[in-house]
Amino acid sequence: MEKALCLSWRMGALPGHVEVSREGKAALTVTTGEASVSCSIFFAGKEKPLVLEAAAKAEEKIALRFLPARLELWVGDALADEEWPFGECLYRGETPHPAVTVAEEERAEAPAPAVTGTFTHAAGWRPGGGVYVGDCMPFVHDGRYHVLYLKDRRRHHSKWGLGAHQWAHISTGDGVTWQQHPMAVEITDPMEGSICTGSWARIGGTQYLYYTVRRSDGSAAPIRRSVSRDGYHFTKDEAFAFTLSDRYDGPSARDPKVFPGPEGELHMILTTTRKDSGRGCLAHLVSRDGERWREEAEPMYTSPSAEQPECPDYVAFAGRYYLFYSIRGVAHYLYSDGPFGPWQVPREPTVPCARVPKAAVWRDRLVFAGFLPEEDFLRYAGTMTFKAASAAPDGQLVFEDWEM
């Protein structure tokens, strides 16, 4: 049961601007235009408010909901915008105008079905409603190609720039028709600034999602996980959390990739920085059971500069091993005859798939998924994009468009 404080009114019932103040400072403002509504919620110690906005027609019902870890703006029966709070909210439930109803709600959410919707052709797709596709994390299970992706609003500017990303989930059996599944990992605690990129792993009969959580207070990012039996409904494992040792920069640790080793052990690589040299790297950890992890003496890869190799990926493919990472959104790869190197640099080391793509082996090819910004390439999030690759006899990848 989830409790919410709900403010509701009809478009046209309020003057253009109403405000609730506390100790001489704005706590809540609601601004309405002919076809729009904007709500600003203020917090102690924050210079800027969280702002939720939506288009709305005359007489439509507007609802602003305050939940412990989320703010929602509804227009009619549609969720139009979201934000994610942290800290002391200055608004305490006062009525901003006689036309506004303020009430407490209790919402019992039934488990979502495994398939919540369908669509065709994921290339160029995004969910709509102000939601964009961020980093993609593909995997293959039971013959289906799955993509977990960061659900993005405001191009990484939600929650005062922390991102407030959550994991959404789609899959396909033929590359044409796609199913939408329940949210895989959501923000459920105000201390969670963003659920960062990670990876899927199957250990025994259980499926896991490994990820780091960017902390709202800037402290070291813990490595966390969620657990599922059916692969569609995941639950956070609240007992599982650890951080890297002080050899590495803890707050920047992110993007764990978990994969099986040649002797049945599990390996994890993740983005961070070596404190001794200041160079970006992929820290390397090993586990026998997925529960207890130990750091290897050396990273899997160390960058020649301070730039961090982001969104790492590791794939065994066509008799060789491939290590991927992204620099400024552009993916690079290395390959080796052995599982952990020595790594060779291909003649053309970049992956021609925007941005920060990761891959899974499906139908004898590597199929990459990434995101393509709709305007400025350097702006975060956009629509989903794909690329496929096969391996040449010498191990270098040959890329092609992915079309079904």
Language model regions located:
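Carbohydrate-active catalytic/glycan-binding domains of CAZyme proteins
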Residues: E2-C6, R10-A13, H17, S38, ...
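Glycan-recognition/cleft segments
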Residues: H17-I41
